[in-house]
């Protein structure tokens, strides 16, 4: 893993510029600015991992005050996928996921996440048809954010009735138990308006 953990500009853009466009209140933008993310200025090429975790925590608290921090982080993970598809790199990557399907999408987990940071490593264990364990080396203090990204990516790849459970989270690494129903024949991305329904069709438990 890299000596200094960095999150790249395109990840910040996917969440805060694209995925949450028009949804950030002034109080949230002010708190983000204080934490090191000024959305009124050009984004930096990369941000420290600890700062990234702070940005996500602030957004979760500000946008989803009636929900737990973990539930809000999950929604931010989905927003990351929604926003990523609006970037040039994201459009290319998510189009590929539709072709690959859910299983091969998971096989590319490290490569997919490394498009947005310099530290992700993963190991995938296939337990049965549409049933996997995905270990990730660093998910920070908000593992449900990564779960939301996995959920959104699998949905993009055509999976339905997605279920994600967390196991063995130690503050850094986490194992995600993932299962889904048969992939849909037409695996287009659910639009932003479908986000709530898509979340309800999935499940996550902290064990």
Please name every model-derived segment.
Residues 37, 41-145, 166:
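Amphipathic interaction/junction segments at domain boundaries or subunit interfaces
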Residues 2-18, 114-147, 154-207:
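Short terminal or interdomain "cap/linker" segment that borders an active site or interface and mediates
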């Amino acid at each position: 893993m890299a000596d200094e953990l960095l999150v790249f500009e395109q990840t910040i853009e996917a969440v805060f510029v694209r995925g949450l466009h028009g949804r950030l209140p002034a109080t949230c933008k002010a708190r983000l600015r204080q934490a090191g993310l000024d959305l009124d200025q050009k984004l930096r090429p990369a941000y420290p991992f600890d700062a990234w975790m702070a940005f996500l925590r602030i957004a979760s608290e500000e946008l989803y005050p009636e929900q737990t921090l973990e539930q809000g982080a999950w929604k931010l993970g989905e927003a990351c996928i929604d926003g990523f598809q609006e970037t040039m790199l994201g459009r290319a990557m998510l189009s590929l996921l539709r072709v690959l399907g859910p299983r091969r999408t998971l096989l590319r987990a490290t490569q997919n996440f490394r498009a947005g940071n310099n530290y992700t490593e993963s190991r995938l264990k296939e337990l049965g048809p549409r049933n996997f364990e995905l270990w990730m080396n660093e998910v920070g203090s908000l593992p449900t954010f990564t779960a939301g990204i996995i959920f959104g990516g699998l949905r993009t790849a055509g999976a339905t009735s997605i279920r994600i459970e967390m196991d063995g989270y130690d503050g850094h690494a986490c194992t995600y138990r993932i299962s889904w129903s048969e992939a849909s024949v037409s695996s287009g991305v659910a639009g932003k308006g479908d986000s709530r329904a898509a979340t309800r069709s999935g499940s996550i438990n902290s064990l």
